[in-house]
């Protein structure tokens, strides 16, 4: 009697060996539409060949890490240099990776806030926040700011500002590199009023020693530890 088929797991997901530049990767190309099409084209053009070789792609190693382990890894893998994040977002665009998954600005803000833990007074239990989701969403916000198309830039810029302000005001969740790069992206894309700048400056930490300690401690990868509401600002 044959055994029933088991659902596919991450471990059993087929991967394709591809050399990008000088580096060989084993990749689940279903997550990267451009490479999926590239492999299909090469396989049809050269049926006997099992070697897939692509020219170098800028910051591909970091882009792949973000796809496989969560976009929060992108902030951890790059310096707080907006130009590098521009390159990375352009690479995701080139690879046709759907970073935003059709999410609206409101949905992105909601996911940013998902990192906040809470306390259920009726059941007397703590409700853990999902830091991983919130930190991954911070990169989605960055991508939206850098490459997003806005139908009403004046109206949407206010919504984006609220998201950025929430992010920079929650240092327990969003570490220094994230806060620095997302703020820089907003200030590059939109006109920042004096009032908005003052609101952002209120939450800026400038002590180099403390920032270095914070940056060095941003190493969690799988289960990010829970936290609870840490500022007096919310949107």
Question: Where are the predicted features?
Answer:
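Canonical BTB/POZ domain core
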Residues: 3-5, 10-114
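Low-complexity, intrinsically disordered flanking regions
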Residues: 1-3, 220
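Alpha-helical protein-protein interaction/assembly modules
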Residues: 76-89, 98-235
């Amino acid at each position: 009697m044959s055994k029933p088929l088991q659902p596919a797991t991450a471990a059993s997901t087929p991967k394709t060996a591809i050399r990008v530049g000088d580096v060989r990767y084993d990749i689940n190309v279903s997550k990267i539409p451009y490479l999926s099409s590239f492999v299909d084209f090469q396989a049809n053009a050269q049926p006997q060949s099992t070697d897939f070789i692509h020219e170098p792609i800028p910051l591909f190693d970091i882009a792949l890490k973000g796809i496989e382990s969560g976009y929060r890894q992108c902030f951890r893998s790059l310096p707080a240099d907006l130009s590098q994040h521009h390159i990375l977002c352009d690479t995701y665009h080139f690879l046709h990776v759907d970073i935003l998954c059709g999410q609206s600005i409101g949905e992105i803000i909601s996911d940013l806030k998902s990192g906040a833990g809470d306390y259920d007074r009726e059941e007397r239990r703590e409700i853990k926040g999902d830091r991983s989701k919130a930190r991954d969403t911070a990169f989605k916000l960055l991508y939206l700011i850098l490459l997003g198309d806005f139908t009403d830039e004046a109206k949407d810029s206010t919504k984006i500002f609220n998201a950025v302000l929430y992010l920079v005001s929650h240092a327990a969740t969003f570490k220094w590199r994230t806060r620095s790069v997302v703020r820089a992206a907003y200030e590059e894309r939109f006109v920042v009023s004096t009032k908005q700048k003052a609101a952002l400056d209120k939450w800026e930490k400038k002590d180099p020693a403390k920032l270095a300690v914070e940056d060095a401690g941003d190493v969690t990868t799988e289960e990010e530890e829970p936290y609870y509401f840490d500022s007096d600002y919310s949107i």
